[in-house]
Amino acid sequence: MMKAGRFGMSRKFKTPCFIMDKRRLEENLEKLSNIEKESGVKILHSIKSFNKSSILPHIALKLSGMSIGSKRELNMAQKANAKHLHLHAPAFKEEELLLMLDEVSTISFNSLGQWERFSTIASKASMGLRINPNLHLPIPSYCNPNLEYSRLGIGYLEFLESYKKNSNLFRNLDGLHFHALFQSSAQGLMVLLEHIEQHYGEILPKLRWINLGGGHNFTDNEYDVKSFVQLLQKFKSTYSHIELYFEPGESVVKRCGDFITTVLDIVPVAEQNVVILDTSIETHLLDVAIVNQRLKVKGTQSSSTPYFYELTGNTCLQGDIIGEYFFIDKLNIGDSVVFEDMMGYSMVKMTEFNGMENAEFILV
């Protein structure tokens, strides 16, 4: 149990739990809404990053729509009364796609094969293609969609060659989708727009929309909104007919809440203090398991202290290790360990490995 004094409350919460600060969420949504107004673009919330049904309707009120990848996410977005719905997945089953086509606003197919199979189906959806621009950007390989061997999107040279050979194949092409950035500043957008203007001059006049994807660090305190607006104004001065969409993942819930755990035991192993928490990398912190992500822990520092602990989970998996940290104060059984900035890409990945329960979500 932990007392949420840091959130200005006195009641206790059962751990593990995710606690969201609604004031910070509102600040992020207000900033994103202002970016929409200043730049004239439409920002879509990516449900894959955060999908709590109690919060989605409020997000839908503030932003222009949602980005989805499946029938289940479509249902979530519709229940939240989201306006514009953009659909994209690496591949679609025909029977599932037919159920969604008339329910979404825009769709991006991921390959030429899927385009050839499905783009001629009569529907209300505006059809597009996801392109891999093969940009050379400093992005971790596990989430870099620009890699030459990435399965995400058609390589831009392959697309341009196909268009040149048979432009009639793309007669229904309304939009292009570029998801090429990761936690990027406005500089990343500049690189992407330069690529688009350099390579698609023949195609741009015929398009209705471009989806510039996620990876834009909009709600970071250092994000240069002025430069962002200027870049888009320059692009729109030439291509005013093209609607621009962005679908940030983390930006909506960045710095909006933490994950709270409790120390169950402290075990001395080979002259090291191993802390067992009421969580697991397999159940609540899956990105630690998948990509060896290092989490931010409240009350720790990078330099040495007398209180050095290895934080671990409470499952039978030997590799259930969160990481090693220098704490400012000594830990005791029953203490809270707080993982900071944990709203994005966490709850959507929870499992029940080893019988562990899902962590509760609390809005304060």
What are these regions (language model features)?
Residues M190-I196, D224-L231, T261, F326:
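Charged helix-capping and loop-helix junction motifs
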Residues L231, E243-V364:
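Charged (often Lys/Glu-rich) extended helix/loop segments that serve as interaction or gating elements
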Residues L231-Y239:
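Structural alpha-helical segments in enzyme catalytic/regulatory domains
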Residues H179-L181, I210-T219, P248-E250:
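Glycine-rich beta-strand-to-loop/alpha-helix junction loops that act as flexible
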Residues M2-A82, L87-E96, S280, F327-E340, ...:
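N-terminal capping/small domains of soluble enzymes
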Residues L135-L137, F182, F218, V252, ...:
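Feature marks short, surface-exposed loop/turn motifs that line or immediately flank catalytic pockets
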Residues V41-W209, K234:
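Active-site-proximal beta-alpha core segment in soluble small-molecule metabolic enzymes
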